Structures are given as structure tokens and as C-alpha cells.
Regions:
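Conserved donor-binding/catalytic core segment of Leloir-type glycosyltransferases
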Residues: 152-172, 178-182
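Conserved acidic donor-binding segment of nucleotide-sugar-dependent glycosyltransferases
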Residues: 278-290, 299-304
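Short alpha-helical donor nucleotide-sugar binding micro-motif in glycosyltransferases
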Residues: 234-239
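A short, well-ordered alpha-helix in the C-terminal region of glycosyltransferases
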Residues: 299, 306-320, 332
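Nucleotide-activated donor-binding/catalytic signature segment of Leloir-type glycosyltransferases, i.e.
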Residues: 207-230
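Aromatic "clamp/platform" in nucleotide-sugar-dependent glycosyltransferases that forms part
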Residues: 247
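Short hydrophobic beta-strand element within catalytic cores of glycosyltransferases
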Residues: 264-267
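Donor nucleotide-sugar binding/catalytic pocket of nucleotide-sugar-dependent glycosyltransferases
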Residues: 109-144
């Protein structure tokens, strides 16, 4: 097959899970010999890729100067503002109820959804979306070589819980997750040590820095701010439990990464339906409320063997979701639409 020319339009290259997705995909496509450009506006606050990326980066404003097979973007405003004659316009929906997303769907040649939940959300609104679930970099995120979690459980020490601490975004549910950990510890009588981590955008001041923010919880807790990728993998690999209370997520990167590193996951259904099967690969709360999450967490605190079984099943399941697989699904959808357009042109 001929290489594809793919222009990815992003609002910035800052430290966000949604940006990770396209840096990972761009790296896969570049290794496969495709011509990939990740383009951001000249006015973007973060224009340096925060993950290693061997492909091209450049200006959104200059994208129309080249020939492209496809323009791919998750950002409704950028997607609508850029067009190139002959290029397929593919919108990648990554967030439920994203502002102005409906306007992007209406002009797209092709719409992808980044999870089963997102595809269902789109189809309820009359959009024929193609499923392209997210992935995990399994070379980076895996259990530590010397995994001490089972030995630590046998010794009877506190359970270590981990929460993504992006308090500035309420839909992430970070405060709800922290309160759920406290409630489950109190209900089960099992001591818990909680770690919250965040890599806030430039110019913002996260909770946990300076005077921080009072979480209103009375269990031991600490913040880890701006961890490197190696430090993040280490945090996941040290956690007995990872707790997520997200709402309106497309694909929950943090839950997937924690699962890949061998943590037992307690989560909502938001962004996790593809890999979190309740009672098997994770404990899933029906509602994004602290009491509901605490109820699903309590058995895992009380029973280390159950916690280990769920963690192992989760790690096996998430191993199916590589970025190479996601790249395959996107590439297949793009090629099928390009071929269909070519056949239609010949027939007319």
C-alpha cells in the first residue's frame, strides 16, 4: 500500500492525555513510513511535543500549502477552520458534549469515536461513527520488574491508592475519587495511603502547590506534581488501587495506564467500557459518586487476593489495546473512505 500523507491538527502540544494520543499515533505512523505532520496554531501556548516524536511538527496556518490525503483532528474549531482540496476530513471525537462538536460532525467526511461509549454517544445523535478505541504504550507502562505489592499485602501494611489529581477539571472527578478512597477505608477498617498526581498546564497553579487546597479528607495523602513519564510509571507500578471518577470521558488514559502497570482499577463507566468489565478486570461504579465508588472499592481493600486477581485480569485485558491497534483502526477507516470516494468518482 502507498504511504499516507496525514496532517493532524491540534490546539497545542501540552501535557494532556488527548495530546498523548496523537503523539503516540503519529510515532506509529511515522515508523510505518507515512508522512505525518502534527500541526498547531502559531498562537498555541505549548508547541514543543512533551513526548518523543520523530515526525514533523509545524504550523496549522501552513497546512494548506501541501497536499494531504487526510486532515485528522479532535478539535472542532481547528477542524472547521482548515481545509485542503482533495483531502479527506476526519474528525476524531474524544470528549462527550464537546463545545461545537456537532458543527464539526456536519462537515466531516469521516467521524471516529475513541471508545465504545463515545461511539454510542455519537450514534444516538445520528452520527455514523467508526470505533477507534484508545491505547496504551506497553513498553512504557507495565508492572515493575520487582513488584512488591503482594509481599506488602502479606505483611499487612496500608493499601496504597492512586488518583489523578486534576482538580481544575471537575469532570475528571478527582475530589470525588479522593473522598471515595477515604470512605472505603473508613467502611472497611483498612488503612490507606493516598497519592494524587498532576501535571498542570503552564501558567496554572495546581492544588498541592504552595498553600494548595484542603481536600477535606482525613487519611494520609500526598501530592506528586509534574512527574516524568518514568516517575508516572513508577507511581502506577507501586499502587495497589487506582481510582477514577471521570464523567464525560472519551478514553480514560490514566485508568488504562494504571491497569497496564498492575494496579487494580476502581472506576466509573466513563471512558473505560472497552477494558473495564465489572467484577473481572475492574470494579466499576454505576454512578460517579463517592459513596458508590467506595462500595465497589471496599471488597478490594478487604481481600488482597481478590485485588490481585482483578489486577492480573485487568493487565491481561488492557494488553489488547496498543497504540499500534488504534493506528490500524484509524488507517483502515481512512483507506476505506478514500477508496470509496475514488470508486464513486470513477463511476460518475
Amino acid at each position: 500500500m502507498d504511504p499516507l500523507r496525514i496532517a493532524v491538527l491540534l490546539p497545542h502540544l501540552g501535557v494532556y492525555g488527548g495530546i498523548r494520543r496523537f503523539l503516540e499515533l503519529g510515532a506509529v505512523w511515522t515508523r510505518r513510513g507515512h508522512d505525518v505532520l502534527i500541526a498547531t496554531p502559531r498562537s498555541a501556548t505549548a508547541r514543543e511535543a512533551w513526548l518523543p516524536f520523530a515526525g514533523r511538527t509545524g504550523d496549522v496556518e501552513r497546512v494548506p500549502e501541501e497536499r494531504w490525503d487526510v486532515l485528522l483532528s479532535p478539535d472542532p474549531d481547528l477542524f472547521r477552520s482548515v481545509s485542503v482540496p482533495g483531502a479527506l476530513r476526519a474528525f476524531y471525537a474524544v470528549l462527550e458534549k464537546a463545545p461545537r462538536a456537532r458543527a464539526a460532525w456536519s462537515v466531516a467526511d469521516l467521524v471516529f469515536g475513541n471508545s465504545a461509549g463515545m461511539v454510542r454517544h455519537l450514534r444516538r445523535r445520528g452520527v455514523r461513527a467508526v470505533a477507534a478505541p484508545g491505547g496504551v504504550n506497553l513498553e512504557r507502562f507495565h508492572p515493575p520488574a520487582a513488584d512488591v505489592r503482594r509481599a506488602r499485602a502479606r505483611a499487612g501494611g496500608p493499601v496504597r491508592a492512586l488518583v489523578y489529581g486534576r482538580l481544575s477539571r471537575r469532570r475528571k472527578g478527582s475530589l470525588t475519587a479522593a473522598r471515595a478512597v477515604e470512605a472505603a477505608s473508613r467502611r472497611s477498617g483498612v488503612p490507606v495511603e493516598l497519592t494524587l498526581f498532576d501535571a498542570p498546564p503552564p501558567g496554572s497553579r495546581p492544588a498541592g502547590e504552595g498553600e494548595g487546597m484542603d481536600l477535606g479528607i482525613r487519611i494520609p495523602h500526598r501530592w506528586v506534581l509534574r512527574p516524568t513519564q518514568e516517575e508516572l510509571a513508577s507511581l502506577y507500578g507501586d499502587a495497589d488501587l487506582f481510582v477514577s471518577a471521570e464523567r464525560r470521558a472519551g478514553w480514560c488514559n490514566t485508568a488504562a495506564e494504571a491497569m497496564a502497570c498492575g494496579a487494580a482499577v476502581v472506576c466509573t463507566r466513563s471512558g473505560t467500557e472497552d477494558f473495564a468489565r465489572d467484577g473481572f478486570t475492574a470494579h466499576v461504579s454505576r454512578w460517579p459518586w463517592a459513596w458508590s465508588l467506595a462500595r465497589r472499592m471496599t471488597p478490594l481493600l478487604r481481600d488482597p487476593a481478590l485485588r490481585a486477581r482483578v489486577a492480573e485480569a485487568g493487565r491481561e485485558k488492557i494488553g489488547e489495546f496498543t497504540w499500534e491497534r488504534t493506528a490500524d483502526l484509524l488507517e483502515r477507516g481512512i483507506r476505506e473512505r478514500l477508496e470509496g470516494r475514488e470508486h464513486a468518482a470513477k463511476a460518475s
